[in-house]
Amino acid sequence: MTRAFDGDTLLIATHNKGKLEEMAHLLQPFGVKVVGAAEMNLPEPEETEDTFVGNARIKAHAAARATGLPALSDDSGITIDALDGAPGVYTADWAETGNGRDFLMAMTRAHDALEAKSAPHPRLAQFRCTLVLAWPDGHDEVFEGVAPGHLVWPIRGAAGFGYDPMFVPEGYDVTFAEMDRWEKNKISHRARAVEKFVKGCFGG
């Protein structure tokens, strides 16, 4: 059975302000105070695992140990069937330029790799999000969300971020980047993982 969250403060093990604000909004009905890693002056631990859950566990447990607070972290990315699950945990790395991240470059890399393999259409892919809630005593709970879909080229849409302009979610004919934010947030991998987290740990 999932361990319930019964504290009054939850540390979000991220330096991403957007993720912090999103979680604060989602947990507002439960009266939980949310603090971020930057607020607690926590360094970003090195992500050395080759799975989403492994990297999420590293971040959550490091934050819980350092602060004595329950800590929630996430690791997410896109897996492409014809590329044997790549880029996977290296989703963001594919965009690294040494001068910031360039996701147009990353999407082009994915498309070129598919073309090189003459991958058939539809080119199936999944966005994946793994949330880990860790307690200072070493216990953790894992929640995973998946958004299945396929990739298109050329890219479409100006909203969203990352690989959104090339990803069409299952059951739709528009990319994540062509959707309203509220519409994407209802069906995204992150939304599905958060829904499981809230239901499991808050009974919401």
Swiss-Prot record:
Cofactor: Mg(2+)
Record-annotated active site: 75 (proton acceptor)
E.C. no: 3.6.1.66
GO BP term, pick one: nucleotide metabolic process
Keywords: Hydrolase, Magnesium, Metal-binding, Nucleotide metabolism, Nucleotide-binding
Binding site for substrate: 14-19, 76, 161-164, 184, 189-190
Any GO CC annotation of this UniProt entry: cytosol
Transmembrane feature ranges: none
Protein name in UniProt: dITP/XTP pyrophosphatase
